């Protein structure tokens, strides 16, 4: 039996002040159920950044993982685009 698939999200690094941790803001778009207007919502995730190579402004891919601390349940899997 195959292991369950882990969630993968894309987001922008908004903070790298902590050691081996970055805060990633993930944007989701959905339509309002009644008014059918496009609603954009943001959610911040604390992600483990083992090599400290992701910086503020980078576009990263984060993967769900086991709890690493009280707030960290995600890990930076790859850096998609560097900040200018």
UniProtKB/Swiss-Prot annotation:
Gene3D superfamilies found in the cross-reference section: Nucleic acid-binding proteins
GO biological process: translation
Assigned keywords, A-Z: Ribonucleoprotein, Ribosomal protein, RNA-binding, rRNA-binding
PROSITE patterns registered for this protein in UniProt: RIBOSOMAL_S17
GO cellular component, one term: cytosolic small ribosomal subunit
GO molecular function terms listed in the Swiss-Prot or TrEMBL record: rRNA binding; structural constituent of ribosome
Pfam family, one: Ribosomal_S17
Domain of life of the native organism: Bacteria
Function: One of the primary rRNA binding proteins, it binds specifically to the 5'-end of 16S ribosomal RNA.
NCBIfam families for this protein: PRK05610.1, uS17_bact
Subunit structure: Part of the 30S ribosomal subunit.
Assigned protein family: Belongs to the universal ribosomal protein uS17 family.
Protein name, as recorded: Small ribosomal subunit protein uS17
């Amino acid at each position: 039996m195959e292991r369950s698939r882990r969630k993968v999200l894309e987001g922008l690094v908004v903070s790298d002040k902590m050691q081996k941790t970055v805060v990633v803001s993930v944007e989701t778009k959905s339509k309002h159920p009644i008014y059918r207007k496009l609603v954009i919502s943001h959610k911040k995730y604390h992600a483990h950044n083992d090599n400290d190579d992701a910086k503020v402004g980078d576009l990263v891919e984060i993967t769900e993982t086991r709890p690493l601390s009280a707030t960290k349940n995600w890990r930076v899997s790859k850096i998609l685009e560097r900040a200018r």
